């Protein structure tokens, strides 16, 4: 039974004297790895350059940029949503901080943003200290 179980793993044909020898030899064989194929380049020569991928086209039409939210539609079909007047959007949308992140001394000590920033800075410091240590 051991011979039939180990038969698919046999890589080298060795002379076999008995079943014990067959079992003993098959357990110490090294398995081979089959790596993925290297990419094949089109054309001749060693220094061929891979094909450069192109990004999405950028819309430069000013009329369309002023009336539609270009690039917001993530579906293949359909078109971009139209831009509505300001009074149709909620007020909190215009109060969002889109600039650089506030520093720790600019935040109020009792806000959750302050404590979240403290936790982040502690994690950054901890990671920086443990960067050079080996396990």
Curated annotation (Swiss-Prot):
One of its GO terms (molecular function) is structural constituent of ribosome. Keywords: Mitochondrion, Ribonucleoprotein, Ribosomal protein, Transit peptide. InterPro entries: Ribosomal_mL54. It holds the Pfam family Ribosomal_L37. Its main location: mitochondrion. One of its GO terms (cellular component) is mitochondrial large ribosomal subunit. It comes from the Eukaryota. It is found in: Mitochondrion. The keyword Mitochondrion applies. Component of the mitochondrial ribosome large subunit (39S) which comprises a 16S rRNA and about 50 distinct proteins. Belongs to the mitochondrion-specific ribosomal protein mL54 family. This is Large ribosomal subunit protein mL54. It comes from Danio rerio (Zebrafish). The gene is mrpl54.
């Amino acid at each position: 039974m051991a011979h039939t179980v180990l038969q698919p793993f046999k890589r080298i044909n060795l002379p076999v004297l008995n079943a014990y020898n067959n079992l003993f030899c098959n357990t110490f064989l090294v398995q081979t790895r089959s790596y993925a194929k290297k990419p094949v380049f089109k054309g001749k020569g060693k220094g061929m350059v891979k094909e450069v991928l192109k990004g999405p086209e950028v819309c430069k039409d000013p009329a369309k940029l002023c009336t539609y939210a270009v690039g917001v539609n993530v579906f293949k079909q359909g078109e971009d949503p139209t831009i509505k007047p300001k009074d149709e959007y909620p007020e909190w949308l215009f109060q969002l901080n889109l600039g650089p992140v506030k520093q720790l001394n600019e935040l109020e000590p009792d806000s959750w943003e302050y404590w979240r920033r403290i936790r982040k800075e502690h994690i950054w410091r901890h990671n920086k200290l443990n960067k050079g240590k080996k396990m």
